[in-house]
Amino acid sequence: MNSQTSVVGVHYRVGRKIGEGSFGVIFDGMNLLNNQLIAIKFEPKKSEAPQLRDEYRTYKLLVGNAGIPNVYYFGQEGLHNILVIDLLGPSLEDLFEWCGRRFSVKTVAMTAKQMLSRVQTIHEKNLVYRDIKPDNFLIGRPSSRNANMVYMVDFGMAKYYRDPKTKQHIPYSERKSLSGTARYMSINTHLGREQSRRDDLESLGHVFMYFLRGSLPWQGLKAANNKHKYEKISEKKQSTSISELCAGFPNEFSKYMTYVRSLEFDEEPDYAFLQELFDDVLRANGDTNDGVYDWMLLNDGKGWESSSSHFSVVAMKRRKNYLGLNVVQNDDSRKKNSTLQTQNMRFKSSYGVRGPRNYSSFDALPSKNAPLVRQEQSASKKTIYAHSSRGYDRVRPMYVSQPSNNAVGVNHPNDNSDSEAKGGFFDMICCRCFS
């Protein structure tokens, strides 16, 4: 193959296809100037709802903060917009699966402190995230300096909750379109109320209990369509008391949920108080925040990285419609495609929507980079369960090594399943070794 056909942005070599989503395709790759491993996202320029330029802008707001990946380049290549971003490790959802779909109290408390810090950072930048879920939190690449740092990715749903200059909070409103993932979204979001900081924190609490319990009481509900399913999930969340949700686990988790659900729409959360709750969990449990997580103890203490030839990961293959809703396949189809042998891959992880997990070697030849065709819209926009006409008021991420032509960016010094009312860009990203 001609090397020129697999180099984009002047010096980024495109490797293998590692994921795809509603809006494009992802490849791994390498920066030819410094041999740094990267991920490259491709988006058709004629996409009805292009996201990569906005994604760049969001990362520009957040750059320099712990747990926010670096993004190096945004530009155009042929029929596509491309974005070059740090190659990270697996998502917390992946690690959760590999740990038998249950985390220890210690791991949940330590992970909660990191996740809470990331959300606080976003809030301090005047944004609410609006799609908290385990898939959107990744750890660092194995053997890297920050291998067990929790990173936050996929800011396609983020929105300003206050004016960056005046700090004036947006007004309270109702009858809003759903945005986020039904399993984890707040009760107020289900009720069509404008989201604010309190909703991100409530969603975090649902994720914490998911990690502790293995599942949430509102998972697995059956309904004729997504609208009715969201309604059932909402009803079950409202009827499940906090004491029932948190039964059998340290009382601090109940205190967390009680506090975040009691916040007013425009109230500033006491993040220090919430952090202290998880410190209390560790102390009461006789643990310390030593950075030793459950996934590091797999394979007789060798860690998840050494599990590539030993683990079979159960993965549900989903198809996505125009609205970005992940529709679970029927049971027969799921069984047929349920087991993914990891012998030929280091790991998998998710930048947003979890999708097909059929990894293959794929070079970024122009002939193979045809624009993706999104499926036809099948849901009405007339209810709060449909995509808003403004595309969820997206704001977005990114960084650049050297702008050229239409490229934008700045120089960087370094370097069970519930339907989702969400349109994320990509499904998965994995670290792979170059031969």
UniProtKB/Swiss-Prot annotation:
Q: CDD domains of this UniProt entry? A: STKc_CK1_fungal (cd14127)
- Please list the GO biological process terms of this entry: endocytosis; regulation of endocytosis; signal transduction
Subcellular location, principal? cytoplasm
Where is the Protein kinase domain positioned along the sequence? 12-282
| PROSITE patterns, per database record | PROTEIN_KINASE_ATP, PROTEIN_KINASE_DOM, PROTEIN_KINASE_ST
Sequence positions bearing Phosphoserine: S361
UniProt GO cellular component terms:
cytoplasm; fungal-type vacuole membrane; nucleus
Task: Give the reaction(s) catalysed.
Answer: L-seryl-[protein] + ATP = O-phospho-L-seryl-[protein] + ADP + H(+); L-threonyl-[protein] + ATP = O-phospho-L-threonyl-[protein] + ADP + H(+)
Active site per the UniProt annotation? D131
Which of UniProt's keywords are assigned here?
ATP-binding, Cytoplasm, Kinase, Nucleotide-binding, Phosphoprotein, Serine/threonine-protein kinase, Transferase
Where ATP binds, per the record, is at I18, G19, E20, G21, S22, F23, G24, V25, I26, K41
Q: Which EC number applies? A: 2.7.11.1
Quote one Gene Ontology molecular function term: protein serine kinase activity
Q: Where in the cell is it found?
A: Cytoplasm
Any Pfam family from its record, for instance, is Pkinase
Task: Report the function annotation for this chain.
Answer: Casein kinases are operationally defined by their preferential utilization of acidic proteins such as caseins as substrates. May contribute to the regulation of morphology.
Q: Which family does it belong to?
A: Belongs to the protein kinase superfamily. CK1 Ser/Thr protein kinase family. Casein kinase I subfamily.
Please state what the protein is called: Casein kinase I homolog 2
Name the species this protein comes from: Schizosaccharomyces pombe (strain 972 / ATCC 24843)
Coding gene? Answer: cki2
